[in-house]
Amino acid sequence: MSRIGNIPVLIPNNVFVKKQDNIIYINGPLGKLNQKIIGDINIIINNNNIIVKRKHNDKKNRALHGLYRMLIYNMIKGVYNGFKKKLELIGVGFRAKNNSNILDLNIGYSHNIIIKLPKSITLEVKMEKNKNTQIILKSYDKQLLGIVAAKIRSLRKPEPYKGKGIRYINEYVIKKTGKSAK
């Protein structure tokens, strides 16, 4: 029995939810999202909450029950409040620039890396003296935000000896000891 799937999802005042065929549409102050529902999952929309039920109790539907409840919850939270991911560049000479939602990274390669971000993601670059450069990504779509942040991080993952690279804020990198002298 899914514990997460049984919790109803509350709908805030400014968010509108509509179900048509097997697609759920969520519209809020920050944007619009939709999700296709597969499997034998029922979505019941009441006045101010959404209840996710499953028709059959087989293994696949038990797994999808909690998944769709959390996807709907994250969609509602996203169009109402939004999500934020922070990355930091650690390394000498590592820089980032924001040119109208185009991220220009100088991270130790012989050339700059240019990433064009989707329209639903807003970009902010903080560069302060004597501090690491921060890249702040904001969006109402949690899935897309996570994919883009992971793609940026994968360009220069933190290396285990000095910790240089791109990492999430508050990410702990396990450091290895170097070679020991005889």
From Swiss-Prot:
UniProt keywords, alphabetically: Ribonucleoprotein, Ribosomal protein, RNA-binding, rRNA-binding
Family annotation (Gene3D superfamilies): Ribosomal protein L6, alpha-beta domain (3.90.930.12)
GO biological process terms, semicolon-separated: cytoplasmic translation
GO molecular function: rRNA binding; structural constituent of ribosome
Subunit structure: Part of the 50S ribosomal subunit.
Chain's role: This protein binds to the 23S rRNA, and is important in its secondary structure. It is located near the subunit interface in the base of the L7/L12 stalk, and near the tRNA binding site of the peptidyltransferase center.
Protein's name according to its UniProt entry: Large ribosomal subunit protein uL6
Source organism of this protein record: Karelsulcia muelleri (strain GWSS) (Sulcia muelleri)
